Regions:
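Short catalytic micro-motifs in class I SAM-dependent methyltransferases
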Residues: 170-171
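Acceptor-substrate binding/catalytic loop of class I
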Residues: 229-245
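Class I SAM-dependent methyltransferase SAM/SAH-binding core
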Residues: 100, 104-155
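A conserved beta-strand element that flanks and buttresses the S-adenosyl-L-methionine
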Residues: 167
Length: 325
């Protein structure tokens, strides 16, 4: 077992008091009289009793941790392009700034920040995902520039005003209460600290595209041939967010908007089709995609649409940049 010498960054997720190292597999909150498990140097700082919804989310992503990149085509240029747009805000932070990624999945985004001389805390509610993220980091970076923890996004185990930036990508819609998360972000951020909310789904596909595809799949019995047939409990119940929702979340967290990016128009249809085909019928080494030059042309088209009144409402995703007042 590895000693959890990164514990200085964390507090008890319940009472927010300091933690003490008991041994290589356990840390204790004396205030709560509660021991938290440490797995391979990763503190498991979850609430004492995880609600059923969150437990099922964690179990699902434990199982899917090895398939995450394959399912979401995260190396595609259309994905990387928009990820780089919000990562730019974090790379501009001063050297030594502490960035917390919540719901970080397999660590793809967090690993891209490690060459920017930032301290990156990679977290997820899934132990399997955090372990997967840890494999993307060199031994010299572990517990120095790259810290790993298992935690609940609605009970962040960090001290008040201790974080320079918080990032959550394609995970806000997995939370039972986004408002609670935004309040937690306000608590842990330093004054003027940044929040990056990346790739959150818009509402309209849930009422137009997905019901149509579901019905079509039932008629054609397509799902019987699919490689992946299940979704997480959060994805099954998700309805996305509209612009008004995001503004209400900011208000709940007393945060100020810096930038709202509209992600994908035509690219949303393309990505949905290709990711479905690849995740159902192709292996990791056989996935198909548009040539990069074609993807760049579609991005130019999408950027043009994003400036047209009315049509700009129909982006597939949002990226929100905000700061603490």
């Amino acid at each position: 077992m590895k000693t959890p010498n990164n514990i200085k960054y964390f507090v008890c997720p319940v009472c927010k008091m300091d933690l003490n190292i008991i041994n290589s597999s356990k840390v204790r909150c004396n205030n709560c009289d509660y021991d938290y498990r440490v797995d391979d140097g990763i503190p498991i700082l979850l609430p004492h009793k995880l609600v059923e919804f969150k437990r099922l989310e964690a179990e699902y992503h434990d199982i899917e941790s090895d398939s995450y990149a394959e399912i979401n085509m995260i190396s595609s240029h259309r994905v990387v392009y928009h990820h780089e747009k919000y990562l730019k805000h974090l790379r501009e932070l001063p050297v030594g700034s502490v960035v917390l990624e919540v719901g970080g999945g397999d660590g793809t985004d967090a690993s891209k920040l490690l060459d920017s001389e930032l301290i990156v805390i990679q977290s997820d509610i899934s132990v399997g995902m955090v372990k997967k993220a840890k494999t993307k980091v060199s031994l010299s970076q572990i517990n120095s520039s790259s810290i790993h923890v298992v935690c609940d996004a609605e009970q962040i185990p960090c001290k008040n005003g201790s974080i320079d930036a918080v990032m959550i990508v394609a995970a806000l819609h997995h939370l039972p209460s986004p408002e609670v998360f935004f309040k937690e972000v306000n608590r842990v951020l330093k004054s003027g600290g940044l929040l990056v909310v990346g790739f959150e789904p818009n509402t309209w596909p849930y009422f137009v595209i997905y019901p149509f595809l579901k019905r079509l799949g039932e008629l054609l019995s397509v799902r019987k041939r699919f490689k992946y047939t299940e979704a997480s409990i959060a994805d099954q119940g998700a309805l996305g967010f509209n612009e008004k929702d995001l503004k209400l979340f900011l208000q709940a967290g007393n945060l100020e908007i810096v930038e709202l990016q509209r992600v994908w128009f035509l690219n949303g249809f393309i990505h949905m089709f290709l990711s479905s085909i690849n995740s159902k019928f192709y292996s990791k080494d056989e996935k198909i995609d548009l040539p990069v030059f074609a993807q760049k042309i579609v991005i130019i088209f999408d950027n043009f649409i994003s400036h047209i009144p009315f049509l700009r409402r129909f982006c597939w995703h949002w990226t929100l940049i905000a700061k603490k007042l």
